[in-house]
Amino acid sequence: MTIRPLHDRVVVKRLEAEEKTASGIVLPGAAAEKPDMGEVIAVGAGKIGKDGARRPLDVKVGDKIIFGKYSGQTVKADGEELLVMREEDIFGIVE
């Protein structure tokens, strides 16, 4: 199943969480925080402004991004957990 986001929405796959702390302590799955970084796997066509013109998104497929811990809506596609969020929920692109 492929998800094609609409308007200014973005589909993101979370990057794998760190399973060890900086001091080397291994965290069990429940204790590890969900990462706030991900990779963009699909983008919408852009938001339509008040003038009727479509504004393309600043992010593109393949970008690594940072977003808030509670950003987006979790969806499952082909057994994989993905996030669908608006572009405004993205803090920045990791370069």
Curated annotation (Swiss-Prot):
CDD domains documented for this protein: cpn10 (cd00320)
Compartment(s): Cytoplasm
Entry keyword Cytoplasm: yes
Keyword Iron: no
Cited SUPFAM superfamilies: GroES-like
InterPro entries named among the record's database cross-references: Chaperonin_GroES (IPR020818), Chaperonin_GroES_sf (IPR037124), Chaprnonin_Cpn10_CS (IPR018369), GroES-like_sf (IPR011032)
Keywords recorded for this protein, A-Z: Chaperone, Cytoplasm
Entry similarity comment: Belongs to the GroES chaperonin family.
Function recorded in the entry: Together with the chaperonin GroEL, plays an essential role in assisting protein folding. The GroEL-GroES system forms a nano-cage that allows encapsulation of the non-native substrate proteins and provides a physical environment optimized to promote and accelerate protein folding. GroES binds to the apical surface of the GroEL ring, thereby capping the opening of the GroEL channel.
Protein name: Co-chaperonin GroES
Species assigned in the record: Neisseria meningitidis serogroup C (strain 053442)
Highest classification ranks of the organism: Bacteria, Pseudomonadati, Pseudomonadota, Betaproteobacteria, Neisseriales
Underlying gene: groES
